Each structure stands twice: as structure tokens, then as C-alpha cells.
Amino acid sequence: MRKGFFFDLDGVVFNTEPLYSQFWGEVGKRLLPEIPDFAKQIKGQTLPQILDAYFSGQLAAERDDVVSLLNDFEAHMDFPYVPGFLDFIEWLDNKGADTALVTSSNQMKMAQVYRRYPDFKHLFKEILTAEDFNESKPSPDPYLKAAERFALGPEECVGFEDSFNGLKSLRAAGMKVVGLATTNPPQAIGELADYVINDYTAPEPLNRWLEKL
């Protein structure tokens, strides 16, 4: 069994993607009505990437408003766990695995998570946020930095992702990839993942697969 197990946050630990889809859908309708399915277009992108790509030029004046809206949204949103996650992370902990959260979310958002779940930090041995990376996903940098925290090589690590950018990041890092079909359908992410799950509620097949690695 491999030693390092790294997790994205939204769509992997928390089932928040539907909430963000609603938020960005409303932003798109109001500010970018010419772009259909704006929420789908920006899935897996960091806030700076979204702002640079869509809120520059004529819409540059809207940047602060978008950031303010997002901060307020995250301050009041729910953070429901992906079903079965807590049992799965406990299983890994009992195996003595090195676990890390590797998220493009910033410390401001994580402060809301810690406020909601004071023990959240204890679920992982390391937590890496946007402030820790030189480059965002799909660059391999976030996951390679996580491996460095444990002095592990990529071949010793498994990553869990839901977005295309996240899956590409793991692939580029040379790690085994578990894809979660919480954001995109299984057939859409299958080519980028070594193993695909809907959630963690039927862990036995996944656990057996991981133990063979």
C-alpha cells in the first residue's frame, strides 16, 4: 500500500460543488450573460484564474464586487461532507498513512471551515492551501509540494480529485489518481483517473485496490 494520500477539498472532502455551481451560475447570469453555462466553464479554476480570465478589461470594475460576494457566500455556506469520507479518512489514519489536504482554497475560506468544524485540522497530517503554491492546478506543483512535506516520491502517493484541472495536476505529478464523480460524470473523468468512485459509501473495493498498490 502506498504511503501518501492527498485530497482536494471541494467535491472530494466536502460536497460543495452544487453550491458553487449555483453561486457562479448567478454571477454569470448577472455579469456575463453572453457565456452559457458559466458555472461549468470555471469548474476547477482558482479565484485568481477566474478573475483574470473573465473579469478584466471592461469588467475589471466588477472584480472587487465578485470577491466580496464570494467571501460573503462562503461565510454562510454549508460544508456537507461527501458521504463516507470521515470513515474513509479514519481507515487511512488507522493504516498509518500520511494524509494531506491539497486545496486551491485560500486561508480566508479555510477559516470558515475551521469555524464550522473545529477538529477539521486533525483529519490530515498536513494542510496545503493556495498560499503554499507557486502554480495552481493543473500544474503538478501543489501535489509535488505535498509529497515533499513527507519526503515521499510521486510513485508513493495517491491523490483524490473531482475536477479536470485537479485530475490533470495529479497525472502531471506522476501519482495514482482516484477520481470522484461528484462534479463530472464517471465517463468524463475516466481517462484521467486510475479508479473512479461516486463517494466513499462503499469503501471495500476501493480499499482493496489501494492495498494492492
Report the location of each language-model feature.
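Asp-based, Mg2+/Mn2+-dependent phosphohydrolase catalytic module
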Residues: 1-3, 90, 106-108, 112-213
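Active-site neighborhood of HAD-like aspartate-dependent phosphohydrolases
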Residues: 1-40, 57
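Conserved phosphate-coupling serine/threonine residues in phosphotransfer and NTP-handling enzymes
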Residues: 12, 103-105
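Helix-loop "lid/cap" segments that line or gate small-molecule binding pockets
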Residues: 27, 46-58, 113, 147
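Short, surface-exposed acidic
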Residues: 31-41, 57-67, 120-124, 154
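Metal-dependent phosphoesterase signature
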Residues: 52-90, 95
